Amino acid sequence: MFVTKPYDRLHAQEYALAFALKRNALFPDYTGIGGDCTNFVSQCLLAGCCEMNYTPTYGWYYISPKERAPAWTGVQYLYNFLTQNTATGPFAKEVRASEAELCDVIQLGNRSVGFYHTLIITGFERNTFLVSAHSDDAKNRPLSSYNYQRIRFLHIEGVRFEMPSAENCFTALMQQQSILAEDAADGAEAATEEETELRAPFVPLQLEPESEERREDSDRT
């Protein structure tokens, strides 16, 4: 049985603004091999929900460059996951622009290739949204400055989980430290053995070099 918790929009916003113009060392940069936009927005969503979905193929998770769900980096895959997810992790519905809120997701497209770019709302200015993104990097850029033929808004309704996480991943993400459950467990075990009340630090992920071949499930831009 799942429990629903709110999506922390302020945490997602803080993360997005902190890493819009730089990269978090925990994650690869797919800019040159398909695009980093959905990878970046997935990181922002994680900062606001701290809950992944490890369902093979159809889930939403990142463990390593070779162990990640298509939805973590693919524009259409992310849309499919968010709008169809009935298990753990964030879930969303497509809404009108007037219903979109802070740190909801925007996807842009055209008539020939479909949707190709993922952005996150990080502010509001007059009659437009301010968005942040990777590939091309943008921080609080007016949505009105983009050229596109199609647009859709995904409102994050909440986050489902089976049991509360022992750790809040937001601080670890901001400090570019590991958020993997096994790392946290190892740290807790070490602290117990040493009979100390100090929590063991997260262990940074050791990322493998990404292949230069374009991933089929990566972004288009």
Residue ranges and their predicted role:
Residues 12-14, 129, 151:
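A broad, low-specificity signal marking well-ordered, structured residues that form hydrophobic/aromatic
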Residues 1-73:
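N-terminal capping segments
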Residues 47, 51, 127, 137:
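Short loop/turn segments at secondary-structure transitions that flank enzyme active sites
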Residues 10, 121, 149-150:
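A structural signal for short, hydrophobic beta-strand segments that form beta-sheets
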Residues 61-134:
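...with weaker cross-activation on analogous glycine-rich loops/strands in unrelated enzymes
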Residues 147-221:
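Low-complexity, Gly/Ser/Thr/Pro-rich intrinsically disordered linker/tail segments
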Residues 132-148:
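Catalytic alpha/beta core of large soluble enzyme barrels
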Residues 54-57, 118, 143:
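Short, solvent-exposed loop/turn and secondary-structure capping segments
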